[in-house]
């Protein structure tokens, strides 16, 4: 199929999106999540292909179920034959060379998942491209779905460094949360990775005290041959030291506009990444020990043309009803109080907050809405790194702690 100059197929012009509104509370029914339900842990070890086989064998039924729901969601959103949409998306992009160059073991991991589940490699490959598919659809029309609120706090004498986020995803992923515990292998450190069955990464931490959380920045320029977000996350977490992790995030070509909050032992960093540049972001230049972000770029100006006007309104303060702006303001108000002790309890209170009921940081799963808090994650860095996470929104699920074996 012929491509346009940005590598996106012309078929997009025929798509008519049907996007449900996230905030139509009258049409949404809240679903209670059991507080006793924990995110299952799946142990992975060996090389990439072996890890993929283990992933698929452990979650074969769940992967079959969530792939079916994923395709139903695409069908609903596009009104087109879902297999045709996936095939056109696959042909319109060219991510494989970047994956093979920067994270070759992950390409083998996808082969292993396909082999052990019986799912086609094309389906397994495209399922990884959560943000990249949103970009593909956004080429035609902005669906208006905002996702994720995150922050990071550097270490002091009274507490270690933390990074944390509410990972907000589409409703069809509800119930398929998984925590991968990956053994160290061939120079790569031990890792804990939050994910969904069939997906290789959403965020995570390694045993050397390096962690990463992410936020979609749909407004930024994308690339049809860059490195996808899931692979960027795993690439960062494969590094043994901070210098290598920072070099990686700055060197690769990024497939999607994305904000990366990276914690390295005692320090925290925030980078807004687009196809053409990676820019470090400081919410307060006088306080580099605190970072926070939602879903609109604040320092990277590598914008898609159709976002220029709306971005001006957000940055000028005119768009005060913007979902991302409201959540960003909520984070700022909560995290910049002069008497904050930055205890774990404060982090949890922030992640559970609903300061604006229509635009909350914590999104309960509701039937009829598009997005919910898939999991809330607190990553503790330093000499004793760990992950705490919930199954779905943190107001309805308790945080469960997982620590590394040799720490």
Residue ranges and their predicted role:
Residues 1-30:
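Bacterial Sec-dependent N-terminal signal peptides
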Residues 11-13, 50-52, 154:
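Intrinsically disordered, low-complexity, compositionally biased regions/tails
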Residues 27-147, 236-278, 283-407:
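C-terminus-biased signal that marks the final domain/tail of proteins
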Residues 132-231, 244, 374, 378, ...:
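Internal mixed beta-strand/loop scaffold within catalytic domains of large alpha/beta enzymes
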